[in-house]
Amino acid sequence: DRPFRAAFMSPMQDHPISVPLWRQLQGASSLLMAVRGGQSMTVALEKVEGVLRPGVQALAFHALRWLGRAEALRQQLAKRPPPPEADALLCVVLALIWQEKDAPYTPHTLVDQAVEAAKHSDATRHQASFINGCLRRFLRERDALVALTDRYPQAVWNHPQWWIDRLRKDHPDEWEDILRANNSRAPLILRVNARKTTRQQYLQALHETGLEAAPVGEHGVILASARPVPSLPGFDQGHFSVQDAAAQLAAPLLLDGLGAQLGRPLNILDACAAPGGKTAHLLELTDACVTALDIDARRCERIQQNLDRLGLDAQIRVADAAQPDTWWDGRSYDAILLDA
C-alpha cells in the first residue's frame, strides 16, 4: 500500500538504495525479537541508528501487522522453528512477500537481501541456506501455502487467538468489524506549529507540492496519503510535528485559559515527556517555563532534538517523576501533564 511504500527510498526497484535493504531487514528483525520479548516497539526504536530508523520502522510495523500470517506460513515451511534470530528474519520477509499486490520490493530482491541479512550476522550466518530455501519454496508454492494458512484465524486476522476469542465473546455481532478496523493503517496527522505558521498557510504549502490534506481539530492536518515525514514541506524549518488528533487535545485542555487567569507566564511540568510532542504543543500555545521530565536519557535526547527543530526551549531533565526529591526545585507548578 502507498503509506508503507512511501517509507522507502526506491520501492519496487532492484538498483541499490541509499541504505541497503539487508540492513533494514536486520533492524526490523531485531525489533520483532524485542517485541516478542515484551519490549515496547517505541523503546526498541530508540536504539536504531537514525539513518536506518524510517525504513526499519516501516518494515517492523508491517511485519507486526501481518505477523499472524507470516508465522503460519513459517510453520508450513519449517515444522521445527529455527533459532529466534532466524525465525524473526524469516517472518519479517514472509510478511513482506506473501502478497504480490503493492509489495515494496520485487520477490527476488527480498529473497536476495534476506540472505544477505542472514550472512551479515553471526546469529544467522549458518541459517542463510535455510532461509533461502524456505523463501524460494514459498515463491514456488505461494498460492497453495497461503490457502493452507487460511484455515487459521490467527493468519486471517493477524491477532492472537486469545484476543480473537475474547472479541467474539464480548462483541458477537461486531468482532469482525473490530478486527478489520484494528488492522487498518492509521492516517498521518500533523500538528502545525503556531509559532512558525498558520494551519491555512501550511495546507497551502502542502497543496503546492501536490499533497491533499484537510484540517482536523484545532491545529491538526490529516494527509490523504502518507509520505516520508522529512520530505514534507517545512520539516527542517519546524513548521509541524507528527501527532495523533487525540494527543493534540491534551495541551489545550490543560491550558484552557490558565495563562489569562494568572496573568503571567506559566510554570508547567510535563512528566514522562518523551518524545516531546505534548511539551512542544504547550510551548507553541503559550509563553511558559516547561520542565520536560523523563526517566530515559536516550528519550530525553529525542525531546531536545524535536524542540531544536521546532525552535522551542524547555528544561529537560532525566529523572523519575515519582521521586521529586531528586529533581524538583521546590517551585510550585501551575499545571502538570502526565501521560502514562
Describe the role of every protein-language-model region:
Residues 2-340:
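S-adenosylmethionine
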